[in-house]
A protein has these predicted regions:
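Short, solvent-exposed loop/turn segments at secondary-structure junctions
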Residues: 6-8, 30-32, 68-71, 100, ...
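Short, acidic/polar
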Residues: 9-14, 122-126, 247-253
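Conserved residues at the C-terminal ends of beta-strands
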Residues: 27, 55, 109, 140, ...
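Radical SAM [4Fe-4S] cluster-binding motif and immediate context
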Residues: 73-231
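A structural motif corresponding to the C-terminal lobe/cap of the Radical SAM core domain
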Residues: 148, 160-175, 179-338
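Terminal or standalone catalytic/regulatory effector modules within metabolic enzymes
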Residues: 339-355
């Protein structure tokens, strides 16, 4: 019996290739897995279990759709499990599940509705986390500030645990209300670590990827976040998105350096099972690896060799711009010389310092 994001797509081929696997779950398993345990030895009843995919004794494929936990607030918090691992230096925390956005490359792009936990229940969980001496909490919400009023309430809750706990969260720079901006600017240094999922600085790329929010608003929000002296903001770009050219990636890195982003993270697109972009890969001209993590190999806009250059650029950024000791110098060189990234990358690859 298997489950997880690997099985969010069509599971028939996997089950036929792996006959030792009896069934797989698609979706959220907290409620349906216990249900399956009541009938695991009665396969004739498996059709009643939402999200279960399996082959019947006569090898007919059965697909029970996707499982969703609608009573999200009613789930037992994972921290209360006897099996919860408290030995890690951080704890992951969901305050919401699902996403308002429709990004075609994300497994949460179709997860509606967004389900939330009450502020009081989150406070109780954080008190337990704090009692175990955990110093870092990674908030798993896809878009922390999709609801500005709720985001403000959460920030005030997080403030109750300062300076003992630092919170890492993903924020959408296009959705920053003036009220939320003021709230962020007043927070103490060290409370937050922000990830700004900008993905690309090109309107056609974002539109093709079905990412909501105006690019102009996102850029204004990103400038604001990067200028805050009381927190660090990392900006993300994704190579391999439809309509995204290599020269535009270099230009976008330079723009983000001009914003003084705390880190610039450049990743290659992965076409994950169950995503709209994977279903439309042929239509969009995307070729990708059939093996996990399903990395994009080529698009109409970017060749195999250019994607390799993007991966090398990512390593350059990690080794220099994203390294505190080198960041100021690297930023200055990027901004003062339009060709610096190209020439420095060529030198590093020729010297076999980056492969």
């Amino acid at each position: 019996v298997l489950g997880g994001p690997e099985f969010l797509g069509d599971n028939e081929e996997f089950l036929r290739k792996n006959p030792f696997v009896d069934c797989v779950f698609r979706g959220e398993g907290e409620e349906v897995f216990p249900q399956w345990l009541t009938c695991w030895n009665h396969p004739e009843q498996w059709h009643t279990v939402p999200g279960l995919c399996y082959l019947t004794p006569n090898k007919e494929y059965k697909d029970n759709g996707i499982a969703r936990v609608l009573n999200f607030a009613g789930l037992v918090p994972p921290e209360q499990s006897r099996f919860f691992n408290w030995s890690k230096p951080f704890v992951q925390l969901e305050t919401t599940r699902g996403c308002f956005n429709t990004c075609a490359f994300c497994v949460s792009g179709g997860e509606k509705p967004v389900r939330t936990l009450s502020i009081e229940s989150i406070r109780e969980r954080l008190q337990l986390i704090h009692a175990h001496g955990i110093k870092n909490v990674r908030v798993l919400d896809r878009t922390f500030n999709y609801n500005p009023r709720r985001a403000k309430e959460l920030l005030r809750l997080f403030l109750e645990f300062h300076p003992d706990i630092r919170f890492h969260l993903e924020i959408h720079p296009a959705l920053l209300s003036e009220e939320l901006k003021e709230e962020l600017s007043l927070l103490p240094k060290g409370l937050l670590h922000l990830e700004a999922g900008i993905q690309s600085l090109r309107e056609p790329v974002l539109e093709k990827s079905r990412r909501m929010g105006k690019l102009s608003d996102a850029l204004d929000g990103l400038r604001f976040l990067c200028a805050l002296p009381n927190m660090e903001t990392h900006a993300d770009l994704i190579a391999g998105l439809p309509l995204y050219h290599l020269h535009e990636i270099f230009e976008d890195v330079r723009t983000l350096a001009g914003y003084a982003a705390g880190e610039i993270q450049l990743e290659s697109l992965k076409l994950l099972p169950g995503t709209e972009m994977r279903r439309r890969a042929e239509e969009l001209g995307i070729k990708y690896s059939p093996l996990p993590p399903y990395e994009v190999l080529q698009t109409h806009e970017i060749s195999v060799s250019e994607l390799q250059t993007a991966r090398q650029l990512s390593r350059l950024l990690d080794g220099f711009y994203n390294t505190p000791a080198w960041q100021a110098l690297t930023r200055e060189l990027i901004l003062n010389d339009e060709q610096f990234l190209h020439r420095f990358l060529a030198y590093l690859t020729k010297a076999n310092l980056i492969d």
